[in-house]
Structure formats: C-alpha cells, structure tokens
Swiss-Prot record:
Domain notes for this protein: The J domain is necessary and sufficient to stimulate DnaK ATPase activity. Zinc center 1 plays an important role in the autonomous, DnaK-independent chaperone activity of DnaJ. Zinc center 2 is essential for interaction with DnaK and for DnaJ activity.
Alphabetical list of NCBIfam families matching this protein: DnaJ_bact, PRK10767.1, PRK14282.1
Domain J: residue ranges: 7-73
Annotated localization: Cytoplasm
Lineage: Bacteria, Thermotogati, Thermotogota, Thermotogae, Thermotogales
Keyword list, A-Z: Chaperone, Cytoplasm, DNA replication, Metal-binding, Repeat, Stress response, Zinc, Zinc-finger
Family of the protein in this entry: Belongs to the DnaJ family.
Listed GO CC annotations: cytoplasm
Gene name of this polypeptide: dnaJ
Source organism per UniProt: Thermotoga sp. (strain RQ2)
Protein name: Chaperone protein DnaJ
SMART domains: DnaJ
Residues at which Zn(2+) 1 binds: 156, 159, 213, 216
Matching SUPFAM superfamilies: Chaperone J-domain, DnaJ/Hsp40 cysteine-rich domain, HSP40/DnaJ peptide-binding domain
Length: 369
C-alpha cells in the first residue's frame, strides 16, 4: 500500500511563502485548538490531528528541513504511477529502502523526529525584548537616565546555563555509543548501502547529561525581574529605538544574551509645539496690552518661566524669538523658543468703555459709525 504524502503547508493552513512568524502563529493556534484534552468525545481524531500539526511544524520551522521538503516533498495533487498486481515500482523502492535502513525515505530527507527524551542541545542567542518608555520635553533638554523594570530570562544560577544538574556530569550517548554519528550498513538487491548521519539524541557531541537541571528543567535559563537604567540622549525623536546590548533574554544552553530594544515615546506637552530643535508657544494678550505694551510670563521646557516684554503698538500675530530657549540639536546647540502673540479684540464694550474709545477716536480723527 502506498504511503500517503502530506502537504505540511495545508496542515498548518499557511501559504508556501509564509514567514517563520506566520508559521509559528499558525502552529500555536492549531495546537491549542486540537489538543486532545479539548476533544474528549473525539480524542482519537484529535490525537491524529495534533500529531500531524506537530510533524508539519517540525519540518517547516527548520529552514534546512523546509528547503529539502520544498524540493522533494508533496506539493499539490499526489502523483500517480502505473502499478502491477505486486505493487507500484516506486512503492517497491520506498519499501526496500525502509527494509534496508528501518527508516522512512522522507525521514532521511527531513530528519527523524527525536523521541521525547532525545534532546539536541547547542548554544543559541537569546531573544530580544522590546520595551516602550515615555519621556517629557524636560528630559530632552540635557538627556535623562530613566530606571526601567521588566521580566527576562536569565542564565540559570544553579547550572550556569548548561541545563545539566550540578555534579551530574555527562555519559556517552547510548544511541551512537559516544561517536556522535549513526552508521548503518545494509545489503539489498540494489547493492551494498552505507548510511551515516548525525546522532539526533546528542546532536553530534557523543555525550548526553546524566541528569537535567532541577531549577530550569534543562533549558539553562530562568525567568527573573530586572532593573536597568536607560540613558536617553538629548532631543531624541518620538519613535526612536535604542538598543541596549545584552539587555534581552539569556541564550539557550549558555548562548549569548539578546538585546533590549527601547522605543522612546515623547509625551506631548500641551504648552508647546515641537519644530525640530525649536519650540513654538502661543500667547494671547488684550488689545489694550498690545496698544500700551506689557510684560508677560512665558514657560520654559525645562521648568520655570522667563519674562517677555511686549512693546507698545505690538500688532496681532507678531512673533518673538527667545534665543537658546528651545531644545538641543545634534551638535548640542539649543534651538529657540518662538512666541506667537495673538491679540484679543472684545466683542462687546460697556457704555463707559465705548464712551472713552469714542473720545479717543475723535481726538485721533478716526471716523466711526
């Protein structure tokens, strides 16, 4: 009977050009959906579906296995071959191959699935962690140092990241006898075959731990809360990403730490509008202040205020520029604080105010209705 080929992309419900992230998301969703414990009334079907999902993910999540699968695996409709009563020619080849090596030919292409107790252990870099931080305009004047607290995986203190229980040591891998390689020799009507591959159980090292670490379960890392201080440069732009080397998760089995990526969010200040290294501030004065002159208080981004003299006869929408009161540029030189002066004209006047203004208009020769 012919061995049914499986379309792993169809099993996970992803296109053939799916990214690793898309494959991972589909896998997580499906293993939750088809976990046998969630289908007690139809457990056998759920177990079979769950097994297929695991099998598909093991191949498609590994770039090398996926490339080999894309080249040799099942794609589209299953091809058919002319068969005799004794079975198809290619069925005989596949069956003979399995008789020789006790392995499915597709397992040779894609790699056998290790048993549950078999674990390949090699150092891998830890994942990066993304963390958003909010800063104010005052933080942008001279820069700031802001404390942050977050969770990350750190190197297991019990095993030092090896995943091995202290003093347990290693033993020769029983699968390969300590050589790190599996060699198989068989004879058939095809001739004499020699097959050699990396031992899946020890990953080619020839050794396996006698006992895995009791604290981390063999992963070499544990979850911890950490505190760090993030240095914010002056006048950083909203959305800027700062990378702190080694601030991410610990690597697997002694691998290097990932990075902490800090995304800076500048908290809007309702008093100012930011324009590069300049700040814009709008102020409204009474028409009499514009006519007679006055002094107004203007806030500064770093805190506190400064006094701005409004000369007599100031026109509406006059712009004043306070040099060096803005934000620092890339060279450390501060921009300006730009003050836009708006003049408020009253919509109604009291009888006394109107009388005074009419007398003033008469003296200045201004015609009014």
């Amino acid at each position: 009977m012919k061995k049914e080929k499986k379309d792993y992309y169809e099993i996970l419900g992803v296109p053939r050009d799916a990214t690793q992230e898309e494959i991972k998301r589909a896998y997580k969703r499906l293993v939750k959906e088809w976990h046998p414990d969630r289908h007690p009334e139809n457990r056998k079907e759920a177990e079979q579906r769950f097994k297929e999902i695991q099998e598909a993910y093991e191949v498609l999540s590994d770039p090398q296995k996926r490339a080999m699968y894309d080249r040799f695996g099942y794609v589209g409709e299953q091809p058919t071959y002319q068969e005799t009563e004794s079975g198809g020619f290619f069925d005989d080849i596949f069956r003979e191959f399995e008789n020789i090596f006790n392995r499915d030919i597709f397992d040779v292409f894609f790699g056998e699935r290790p048993h549950q107790e078999e674990r390949r252990e090699y150092a891998r870099r830890g994942e990066d962690i993304r963390y958003e931080i909010e800063v104010t305009l005052s933080d942008l004047i001279n820069g700031a140092e802001i404390p942050v607290e977050y969770e990350r995986y750190e190197t297991c203190p019990r095993c030092g990241g090896t995943g091995v229980e202290p003093n347990a040591g290693y033993i020769n891998c029983p699968s390969c006898g300590g050589t790190g390689r599996i060699r198989e020799e068989r004879r058939s009507f095809f001739g004499y075959f020699v097959s050699e591959r990396t031992c899946e159980r020890c990953g080619g090292t020839g050794k396996i731990p006698r006992e895995y670490c009791h604290e981390c379960g063999g992963s070499g890392r544990v979850l911890r809360k950490v505190r760090k201080t993030v240095k914010i440069p002056p006048n950083v732009e909203d959305g800027t990403q700062l990378r702190i080397t080694g601030g991410g998760n610990a690597g697997y089995y002694g691998g290097p730490y990932g990075d902490l990526i800090v995304i800076v969010r500048v908290k809007p200040d309702p008093r100012f509008k930011k324009s590069g290294s300049d700040l814009v501030y709008d102020i409204t004065i009474d028409y009499l202040q514009a006519i007679l002159g006055t002094t107004v208080e203007v806030p500064l981004p770093e805190g506190g205020t400064t006094m701005l003299k409004i000369p007599p006869g100031t026109q509406p929408e006059t712009v004043f520029r306070l040099k060096g009161k803005g934000l620092p540029n890339r060279y450390g030189r501060r921009g300006d604080l730009i003050v836009n002066v708006h003049v408020e004209i009253p919509k109604s006047l009291s009888r006394e105010e109107r009388k005074v203004l009419e007398e003033l208009a008469k003296k200045r020769g201004v015609t009014i209705d």
